[in-house]
Amino acid sequence: MYNEQTPGPVIVADPGDTIRVKLKNNLDVEAQTKQWNPQADRTNLHLHGSHVTPKGRGDNVMIAVENGDSQEYIYQIPENHPSGLLWMHPHLHGTTSLSLAGGAALPVFILPDEKDTNNL
């Protein structure tokens, strides 16, 4: 759930923009699920299809945000990033399907610039 809605809102950005997202992990995982998968209450974010750095607080899918913790993600969209529709979703191996089934996804639209040839 993003900003109390599922799916999350559409994020619209231009090439060269910075997208900042604060992920607050409020996963409420039942005890039965935790027995099956002890990591089920951990999560993270991935900007699928983006051409951004995987380092630091960028698109680092190795980060695991524990239940009750927060993480700020900073996505610096390159000036030459192609336009198109991307999506942001959890990407923590072993827990992704549970989060996606709960609606944790949102669209990210990178707008075309005047030189874009994608004809959007």
Question: Which residues make up each language-model segment?
Answer:
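Histidine-centered copper-binding motifs that mark active-site loops
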Residues: 1-120
